[in-house]
Amino acid sequence: SGRASGRFQEPFNEKIASVLCSRLLDENDYVSYELEDGGFMKWASRCKPMTDQATEFVPAYALLCSSKRPSDLGLYDFYVSACAAHGLNVREDVEKMLVVDYLMANFDRHWNNFGVLIDSESKEWLPAAPVFDTGEALWCDRELTQPFGGYTTPRAGMMRPFARRIDDQVERHCRDLSWLDPSKLKGFSEQACDILLGNPFIANEPGRIDKIKAAIHLRAMALTKHTREIRRGRSFTVPDTDAASSTASKRAERHL
């Protein structure tokens, strides 16, 4: 369920993230959430368990604590190499998570809400855990007077999960994206905001829906350009959406 400080938006965000994932990812790549309306201020998101008696979830934090990370090895490379040591290539899985987080402006991806699945009895490592827990997103913590851009964690000890400036992760670690079809983002900003209209704390705040729609659209355009530049073999920097949120969001609105 959502919190008053976040306009009770979190359950709606989980549903929106599921819609986004259904557009971009395979069915097994994400946990699908449904929005339940239990009455005013009693919204909740529900999903089927991603584990059962035969499987367990091991958070990335457990991997971080299980072995010493060399000082010259970044967090991303450490996680990828730790999984590779157990026969898992998780680069594409991480890309998918970071792309979803970027488009959702998720500011709460931490080392306890991504990881791998293992066999409960044999302890054999199974594929990476699906994307889940994307409720703290879409600027639910920001006032309308604030920019709807990226997030920076307050100190290095709170990397979310691989960089303090969260949007930097797309540029640094999403360098393949062969799985991504950006054309599937068409209409997503409208679909997301249609879901948010079910929340009166958002729908009744003048200008909030329009600002969210423009900000999502801006991110979709930036990711599409990033993907094209990668496929052309060029270097591209994902723009600073904080700096762009005033002028570029207005420009994006004209193209919605």
Model segments located where?
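A broad, structural surface signal
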Residues: K15-R23, E92-V100, A214, M221
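Conserved kinase catalytic-core segment
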Residues: Q9, L75-E143
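ATP-dependent phospho-/nucleotidyl transfer catalytic cores
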Residues: R46-L98
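Conserved ATP-binding subdomain of kinase catalytic cores across diverse folds
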Residues: S1-C65
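C-terminal catalytic region of ATP-dependent kinase domains
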Residues: D119-L256
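A generic structural signal for short, non-catalytic loop/turn and secondary-structure boundary residues
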Residues: L24-D26, G38-F40, R109, E124, ...
